[in-house]
Amino acid sequence: MLSAFKLENNRLLRLEFEEGEKLSDSLWVDLVEPAEQDRLQVQNELGQILATRPELDDIEASARFFEDEDGIHVHSFFYFEDAEDHAGNATVAFTIRDGRLYTLRERELPAFRLYRMRARNQTLVDGNAYEVLMDLFETKIEQLADVIENIYSVLESLSRVIMEGKQGDEFDIALSSLAEQEDISWKVRLCLMDTQRALNFLVRRARLPGAQLEQAREILRDIESLLPHNESLFQKVNFLMQAAMGFINIEQSRIIKIFSVVSVVFLPPTLVASSYGMNFEFMPELHWTFGYPGAIGLMIAAGLAPYLYFKRKNWL
């Protein structure tokens, strides 16, 4: 899908191609899962060659942040959650050339959707492509901050469940959620660090206008403040995971202890029963009137003796 926005009275307005408006009037060209005809339209009308899918997947710095004859290129991760609430990072390719911003991505992203909503009601200060780029990065960092706050809230709830140590369906769900929060935290950290690298490149190489340079530095300071919070989330998740595994080990030890005690308690009675189950001809007790109740009593006594001994030693 191809969308384009022009600047009118310092506001971003979507171009209406049906009404004859052209890409040459745009300040920002946004492509989401573009068809081949969308790519050709951008190339024919603006002379801009867009990044390919394999280029979006490159992770080395030289392929993600560079400048050539087609403009300044920055590839950056953006966080998202799909319809099934699975977290992920999608790469967005930014290109600035001739005062125009191009964005290319393979899916709709929350940060872009939020920025477009805000753009309807707010005006740009300088009205240039760099300002739109910085605003998108700023919106992304705000979103990541909200995700971190949500993880704190979820971990607080999980902490209460795990620290109670009551294992059951709720405990199993808590462990699954804990692993999910760790995965989200890792993706947020990856996104923060990637954005930090992108902004450092722009500060050094993009010759940002004064206002956008200060905005980039402000975003970098925000990232620096969020990274320790993200690190503390990993520590909290690790602590809760270790606590959960500790409770599981304790419960398993209790179960093993019960089986051990049962086996030890029943071993002497089994020995007595086995003795009187032998088919020897000369066994005086077999002809004794009280032989059967005597054997039962001996089995009970043989079982109680180790139990009472363990109890006295506080092993139970």
UniProtKB/Swiss-Prot annotation:
UniProt record similarity statement: Belongs to the CorA metal ion transporter (MIT) (TC 1.A.35) family.
Name recorded for this polypeptide: Magnesium transport protein CorA
Subcellular location: Cell inner membrane
Motif segment (Probable selectivity filter): 277-279
Notes on the domains: The central ion permeation pathway is formed by the first transmembrane domain from each of the five subunits. Mg(2+) binding strengthens interactions between subunits and leads to the formation of a symmetrical homopentamer surrounding a closed ion permeation pathway. Low Mg(2+) concentrations trigger both a conformation change within each subunit and a loosening of the interactions between subunits. This results in an open ion conduction pathway. In addition, this results in a less symmetrical shape of the whole complex.
InterPro entries (alphabetical): CorA_cytoplasmic_dom, CorA_MIT, CorA_TM1_TM2, Mg/Co-transport_prot_CorA, MgTranspt_CorA/ZnTranspt_ZntB
A GO MF label: nickel cation transmembrane transporter activity
GO annotation, cellular component aspect: plasma membrane
Function: Mediates influx of magnesium ions. Alternates between open and closed states. Activated by low cytoplasmic Mg(2+) levels. Inactive when cytoplasmic Mg(2+) levels are high.
Domain of life, per lineage: Bacteria
Keyword Membrane: yes
Segments crossing the lipid bilayer: 258-278, 290-310
Species in which this protein is naturally found: Photorhabdus laumondii subsp. laumondii (strain DSM 15139 / CIP 105565 / TT01)
Subunit structure: Homopentamer. In the absence of Mg(2+), interactions between subunits are weakened, and dimers, trimers and tetramers can be observed in vitro.
Catalytic activity reported: Mg(2+)(in) = Mg(2+)(out)
Keyword hit for Endoplasmic reticulum: no
Keywords: Cell inner membrane, Cell membrane, Ion transport, Magnesium, Membrane, Transmembrane, Transmembrane helix, Transport
Protein topology in the membrane: Multi-pass membrane protein
Gene3D superfamilies per record: Magnesium transport protein CorA, transmembrane region (1.20.58.340)
Pfam families: CorA (PF01544)
